[in-house]
Design a protein with these regions (language model features):
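Active-site helix of classical SDR
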Residues: 124, 160, 168
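Conserved glycine-rich cofactor-binding loop
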Residues: 9, 16-18
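Substrate-binding pocket helix/loop in short-chain dehydrogenase/reductase
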Residues: 100-101, 108-113, 209
Length: 254
């Protein structure tokens, strides 16, 4: 396995479990030093960091709520204090709740947007100076299939994920002269309970949420992480402003 990210430093938000943890581990496998963020669960974040160190990598933990601008600044400082620079930002922190729109109050709406959309704004703003100093930095926002297709009972999540796609394109323009590429990965139909290779038993199209995967199975967190790692590597320096769908073709299904 190549270590194409050797010498790079990454901050991954919401990295204590599931897709975020898989991203942190894969970036570390590529040679990056990784700062593992979680809102408050030190045990989960610490376990991810320890697994990275056990594999010969470098890792640090930075707890903090991305919805808090001061916490966002603190986690960026933790990265630069620990490793001296910041080259990669993965905005993965999210909360996903289902509620019918007619039952959704503003507090529920705001809670999701505060983390999923505003959180990406806060951390990106806090990281901008360090990323510009890198000279060849990367921002990867983790969106979602529903941000492009819509879904019932998730108006707040759909809106936040669609907003992330828009933010990605806007930042690709705004940061074009600074050596920073900005892309989005849109996972869908991911079974975080399974490892590489997806479901052991292929499912029929239309298995979940009324939406099929063309490859006949659910994906894994590791497959999402592989797309993120590619976008952070030297082979993707000509890629910016893009949404990469990691959903087995579900984006094309119906």
């Amino acid at each position: 396995m190549t270590r194409e990210l050797e010498g790079r430093v990454a901050l991954v938000t919401g990295a204590g479990r599931n897709i975020g943890a898989a991203i942190a581990r894969d970036l570390a496998a590529g040679g990056a030093a990784v700062v593992v963020n979680a809102r408050s669960n030190a045990a989960e974040a610490g376990a991810v960091a320890e697994a990275i160190r056990a594999g010969g990598g470098r890792a640090a933990v930075a707890l903090g709520d991305v919805a808090d601008p001061a916490a966002a600044e603190a986690m960026v400082r933790a990265a630069t204090d620990a490793f001296g620079r910041l080259d990669i930002l993965v905005n993965n922190a999210a909360i996903r709740r289902e509620v019918a729109f007619e039952e959704m109050d503003f507090a529920a709406w705001r809670a999701v947007l505060d983390v999923c959309l505003d959180g990406a704004f806060h951390v990106t703003r806090a990281a901008l100076a360090a990323l510009k100093a890198s000279g060849s930095a990367t921002i990867v926002n983790i969106g979602g299939l529903t941000g492009h297709t819509g879904a019932p009972h998730r108006a707040h999540v759909v809106t936040a994920k669609a907003g992330l796609a828009g933010l990605t394109r806007a930042l690709a323009h705004d940061l074009a002269g600074s050596g920073i590429t900005v892309n989005l990965v849109a996972p869908g139909m991911i079974d975080t309970a399974r490892g590489p290779g997806g479901s052991a038993t292929p499912h029929a199209p239309g298995h979940r949420a009324g939406r099929r995967t063309l490859v006949g199975r659910e994906g894994t967190a590791e497959e999402v992480a592989a797309a993120v790692r590619f976008l952070c590597g030297p082979g993707a320096r000509y890629v910016t402003g893009q949404s990469i769908h990691v959903n087995g073709g579900a984006f094309l299904g119906g």
